[in-house]
C-alpha cells in the first residue's frame, strides 16, 4: 500500500502520545525522542496534567527557549508546578542531561507562534520549515552571567494580591536566586498596596526593566516611595505615569522637594525614548525641573489632561531633548488664555521628524491659530493630525486646511465641526453642518485628494458622545 506524505508525522504523533500513557516508557526513551516531537507532546502533557512526563521533558528540552506563557493561560497550576519541579531538579543537582539546551524560561505575555509553528509542522511533516520559522529571542544583557537559567516575566500588579501562578513563581525564584536570573522587561502597576509592590521590586533586577506603566492614582507621598526604584531602572526606554495627584496635606515646600527627588532620577535614565504623562497634577509650574533632567532625545512625548502654566510651555519649547520627536500629544491641556508662540517654536524644532500631532481639547480659539500655522505647514513628515475640541470658526478652519493641504504624507486628519455648525444653545444644526462639510470637502478636493479626513462633533444627539464623520458623510464612530 502506498503511504501518503502525511503518514510519517501522523505515526510519529501517535507514537509520541503513547509515551504519555506509559510514564515508565517515557522515562527510558526521552533521550532518543525526535526533537520535533517535543513541542506537540509537551502541549499534550501540559493540557492533560501529565506531571511526571512534564518534569522529564523539561530536563531533556532540546531547545534554547521554553515559551510557557501561552500554555499557563489554561487553568493548570499543577502542570506549571511540575515544570518548575523539573527545572529545580536540574538546578540543584548541577548536572544536565546530554540533550538539555534550555537557557530561557519565557513567561512574557507576547504574541507567540512557537507552539503554533510546531503544531502545524506536526500536521504537515514540515519540520525543517518549523526550525527556520522560529521567532528570534531577545536576550537579557545579564544572561552572560553565572546563572545557567534566565526566567523572563512581565509583571502586571493590578490587584491587592498576585495571581496564583505569579505568587508560586516568585516564591520559587526567591528560594533559588543564586541559581537563576529573573528578568522583567515590562512592569505595569495598576493597583496594589505599595508594601506589596516594594517586596516584588526587591526581587527583580531593576536594570532589566525597559517599560514601566504606573496608573493607580498615587499621591506624592506614595510616589516618593517608588522614586528610588525608578533611578535604578537604567535601561528604561518607556515610562507611563497616569493619575498622579498632589495631596492636600502636602505644603508647597514639600511638593517642590518631592518633585525634585522624583525628577532627578531622570538623570540616570540614559535609554529613555518614550515619556507619557496623563493627569499628572504636580507638573504645574515644575515641568522645567523634569525637562532639565532628561539626558536623551525623546521620540515620544505625551503630556495629556494636565494643568500647565505658560512658563511650562516656554520651557518645553526650549528643551534640547525634544528636537527629534516623532509623536507629540498635548491633548487636554487648556491653552485658551496662553500665547501659542512657545508651541510655534516647539513645532519648528520638531518639523523634520514629527509624524503624529494631537492637539485635541486644548481650547484653542481663532485668534491663536495663526501663530502655529507657518510651523505646522513645515511638518512634512506628519502623517496624523488631530485637532478636535477646539472652538474655531469656518474661516479659521479653512485657513488651517489650506496650510495642511501641502503636507503630502498626511494620511489621517481630524478637525472640529466649526462653530457655525451649532445653534445658540450648543446643539448641532444638522442641515447647516452638512452644508459646511460639503463646502469644505469641495475645497479640499480642489487642492489635494485627502486620504482620510474626519470632522468631529460634540454631544451627538443619539449617544451624547463625540462622533466623527468622513468624506461621504457616513458616521465613522459614535
Curated annotation (Swiss-Prot):
One of its GO terms (cellular component) is cytoplasm. LRR repeats lie at residues 17-40, 99-126, 181-205, 206-232, 233-268, 269-294, 295-326, 327-348, 351-378, 379-403. The keyword Repeat applies. It comes from the Eukaryota. SUPFAM superfamilies: RNI-like (SSF52047). Coiled coil: none annotated. One of its GO terms (biological process) is proteasome-mediated ubiquitin-dependent protein catabolic process. Keywords: Leucine-rich repeat, Repeat. GO terms for molecular function: ubiquitin-like ligase-substrate adaptor activity. Belongs to the PRAME family. PANTHER family: PRAME FAMILY MEMBER 11-RELATED, SIMILAR TO PREFERENTIALLY EXPRESSED ANTIGEN IN MELANOMA-LIKE 3. This is PRAME family member 27.
Amino acid at each position: 500500500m502506498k503511504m501518503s506524505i502525511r503518514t510519517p508525522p501522523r505515526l510519529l504523533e501517535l507514537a509520541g502520545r503513547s509515551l504519555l500513557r506509559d510514564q515508565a516508557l517515557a522515562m527510558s526513551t526521552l533521550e532518543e525522542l525526535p526533537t520535533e516531537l517535543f513541542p506537540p507532546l509537551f502541549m499534550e502533557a501540559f493540557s492533560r496534567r501529565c506531571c511526571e512526563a512534564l518534569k522529564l521533558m523539561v530536563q531533556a528540552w532540546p531547545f534554547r527557549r521554553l515559551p510557557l506563557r501561552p500554555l499557563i493561560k489554561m487553568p493548570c497550576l499543577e502542570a506549571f508546578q511540575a515544570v518548575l519541579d523539573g527545572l529545580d531538579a536540574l538546578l540543584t543537582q548541577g548536572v544536565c542531561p546530554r540533550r538539555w539546551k534550555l537557557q530561557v524560561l519565557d513567561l512574557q505575555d507576547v504574541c507567540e507562534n512557537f507552539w503554533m509553528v510546531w503544531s502545524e509542522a506536526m500536521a504537515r511533516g514540515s519540520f525543517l520549515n518549523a526550525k527556520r520559522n522560529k521567532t528570534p529571542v531577545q536576550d537579557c544583557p545579564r544572561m552572560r552571567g553565572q546563572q545557567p537559567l534566565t526566567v523572563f516575566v512581565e509583571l502586571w500588579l493590578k490587584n491587592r494580591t498576585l495571581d496564583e501562578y505569579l505568587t508560586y513563581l516568585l516564591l520559587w525564584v526567591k528560594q533559588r536566586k543564586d541559581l537563576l536570573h529573573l528578568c522583567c522587561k515590562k512592569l505595569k502597576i495598576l493597583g496594589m498596596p505599595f508594601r506589596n509592590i516594594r517586596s516584588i521590586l526587591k526581587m527583580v533586577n531593576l536594570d532589566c526593566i525597559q517599560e514601566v506603566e504606573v496608573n493607580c492614582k498615587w499621591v506624592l507621598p506614595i510616589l516618593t516611595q517608588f522614586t528610588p526604584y525608578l533611578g535604578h531602572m537604567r535601561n528604561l526606554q518607556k515610562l507611563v505615569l497616569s493619575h498622579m495627584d498632589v495631596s492636600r496635606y502636602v505644603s508647597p515646600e514639600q511638593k517642590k522637594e518631592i518633585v525634585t527627588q522624583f525628577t532627578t532620577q531622570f538623570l540616570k535614565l540614559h535609554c529613555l525614548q518614550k515619556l507619557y504623562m496623563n493627569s499628572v497634577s504636580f507638573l504645574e509650574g515644575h515641568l522645567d525641573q523634569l525637562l532639565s533632567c532628561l539626558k536623551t532625545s525623546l521620540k515620544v512625548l505625551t503630556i495629556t489632561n494636565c494643568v500647565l502654566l505658560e512658563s511650562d510651555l516656554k520651557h518645553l519649547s526650549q528643551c534640547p531633548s525634544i528636537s527629534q520627536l516623532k509623536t507629540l500629544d498635548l491633548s487636554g491641556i487648556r491653552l485658551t488664555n496662553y500665547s501659542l508662540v512657545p508651541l510655534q517654536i516647539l513645532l519648528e524644532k520638531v518639523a523634520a521628524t514629527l509624524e503624529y500631532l494631537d492637539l485635541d481639547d486644548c481650547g484653542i480659539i481663532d485668534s491663536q491659530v495663526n501663530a502655529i500655522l507657518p510651523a505646522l505647514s513645515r511638518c512634512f513628515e506628519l502623517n496624523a493630525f488631530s485637532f478636535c475640541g477646539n472652538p474655531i470658526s469656518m474661516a479659521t478652519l479653512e485657513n488651517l486646511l489650506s496650510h495642511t493641504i501641502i503636507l503630502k504624507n498626511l494620511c489621517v486628519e481630524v478637525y472640529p465641526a466649526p462653530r457655525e455648525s451649532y445653534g445658540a444653545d450648543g446643539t448641532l444644526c444638522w442641515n447647516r453642518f452638512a452644508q459646511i462639510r460639503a463646502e469644505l470637502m469641495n475645497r479640499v478636493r480642489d487642492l489635494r485628494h485627502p486620504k482620510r479626513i474626519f470632522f468631529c462633533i460634540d454631544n451627538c444627539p443619539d449617544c451624547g458622545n463625540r462622533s466623527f464623520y468622513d468624506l461621504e458623510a457616513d458616521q465613522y464612530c459614535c
